[in-house]
Amino acid sequence: MMYSRFRTVAGNLNCAAKRLSSSSTTTTTTSAPSELQQNLAALRARLAMESPSLSDFISLKSDNAYSVEVGTKKKPLPKPKWMKESIPGGEKYVQIKKKLRELKLHTVCEEAKCPNLGECWSGGETGTATATIMILGDTCTRGCRFCNVKTSRTPPPPDPDEPTNVAEAIASWGLDYVVITSVDRDDLPDQGSGHFTETVQKLKALKPSTLIEALVPDFRGNAECVEKVSKSGLDVFAHNIETVEELQSAVRDHRANFKQSLDVLMMAKEYAPAGTLTKTSIMLGCGETPDQIVKTMEKVRAAGVDVMTFGQYMRPSKRHMPVSEYITPEAFEKYQTLGMEMGFRYVASGPMVRSSYKAGEFYIKSMIDSDRAASS
């Protein structure tokens, strides 16, 4: 219907144009210009009445013709009251930050914008200061949808002085417990496992009393890489499965998967000296169901993992996957209780918990010390 109106109007315009052209080349009576002007005025009026307007293409929700919603993006979920963050500070916090800048070292605390940075670096309520140092550079070869770390297929080569710098820095801070993690380095022949091992060994040589948790990538499931790091002298071998089995492909890089991660944790338990703890972590609020969480916990426990942590997924930026749900503190408590009933030696579960959050708290430290005393 609308297109037929356009054709009629176009035909009338052509007729008017021909008459206008004819009047410019021939001499007519004085009444011709008057007739032409009347025809043009009539066409303008008809065009104004029949031309399509904005309302022909959209349905308006209000009297304001231009008050329309653009796009289909969902509004982000508002943060609930229990997700408040504390402001970093304290003498130990300042000391650690200054030393990091001097030695050009990276921490996952800063790279991942962890909300617990201030509490961990300053020692929090227990006075046990912890930090998570990120080695092998600040650029990852993978691109998980939840992670804020930079990515590249060809990141810069590792700094050969990094193991020494990291060991000396941590030894000077007097930390009771440190987490050493790294980006994925699929570009390196040994996935960075040699660099990781050297860092742990140098720190243990300088400060044997410091408990070391190595939060490692999956090394693409390479048993030789896992064995090398497991026997480096660490106290806790950690590798995160990140989310429930059903959401792996939606959350993690395509080179990571649930089975591969479980295999890494089982290999670590086999290769590491007796008394070495294994640990993993998952984020909640990515779209998982309670049943999926429980099934994942059962499989992790069956793999012999000692420690498991649960925390709320927090979207680092608008470029990352949105938060599907904010899990209540009560739900986190239930998963903690269930985990202990399943046989995990320790479960940390709460909205603000991260894989290395309060890693050096008194309970875990006491557990490691107790195990060693019993075996000696």
Curated annotation (Swiss-Prot):
Instruction: Give me the comment on cofactor binding.
Output: Binds 2 [4Fe-4S] clusters per subunit. One cluster is coordinated with 3 cysteines and an exchangeable S-adenosyl-L-methionine.
This protein is called Lipoyl synthase 1, mitochondrial
Question: Entry's Gene3D superfamilies?
Answer: Aldolase class I
Record Pfam families? LIAS_N, Radical_SAM
Q: Which cofactor does it need?
A: [4Fe-4S] cluster
What's the top EC group for this one?
transferase
Compartments annotated for it: namely:
Mitochondrion
Which residues does the record give as [4Fe-4S] cluster 2 binding sites?
Answer: 140, 144, 147
Molecular function terms from GO: 4 iron, 4 sulfur cluster binding; lipoate synthase activity; metal ion binding
User: What UniProt keywords are attached to this protein's entry?
Assistant: 4Fe-4S, Iron, Iron-sulfur, Metal-binding, Mitochondrion, S-adenosyl-L-methionine, Transferase
The EC designation for this entry is: 2.8.1.8
Cite the annotated pathway. Protein modification; protein lipoylation via endogenous pathway; protein N(6)-(lipoyl)lysine from octanoyl-[acyl-carrier-protein]: step 2/2
**UniProt-listed NCBIfam families:** lipA, PRK05481.1, PRK12928.1
Source species taxonomy: Eukaryota, Viridiplantae, Streptophyta, Embryophyta, Tracheophyta
- Kindly give any further remark recorded in the entry: This protein may be expected to contain an N-terminal transit peptide but none has been predicted.
* Binding positions ([4Fe-4S] cluster 1): 109, 114, 120, 356
Listed InterPro entries: Aldolase_TIM (IPR013785), Elp3/MiaA/NifB-like_rSAM (IPR006638), LIAS_N (IPR031691), Lipoyl_synth (IPR003698), Lipoyl_synth_mt (IPR027527), rSAM (IPR007197)
**Family designation:** Belongs to the radical SAM superfamily. Lipoyl synthase family.
Kindly list the GO CC terms recorded for this protein: mitochondrion
Identify the main location.
Answer: mitochondrion
- The lineage's top-level taxon is Eukaryota
The record's section on PROSITE patterns has: RADICAL_SAM
- Could you tell me what reaction this enzyme catalyses? [[Fe-S] cluster scaffold protein carrying a second [4Fe-4S](2+) cluster] + N(6)-octanoyl-L-lysyl-[protein] + 2 oxidized [2Fe-2S]-[ferredoxin] + 2 S-adenosyl-L-methionine + 4 H(+) = [[Fe-S] cluster scaffold protein] + N(6)-[(R)-dihydrolipoyl]-L-lysyl-[protein] + 4 Fe(3+) + 2 hydrogen sulfide + 2 5'-deoxyadenosine + 2 L-methionine + 2 reduced [2Fe-2S]-[ferredoxin]
Domain (Radical SAM core): residue spans on this chain: 125-345
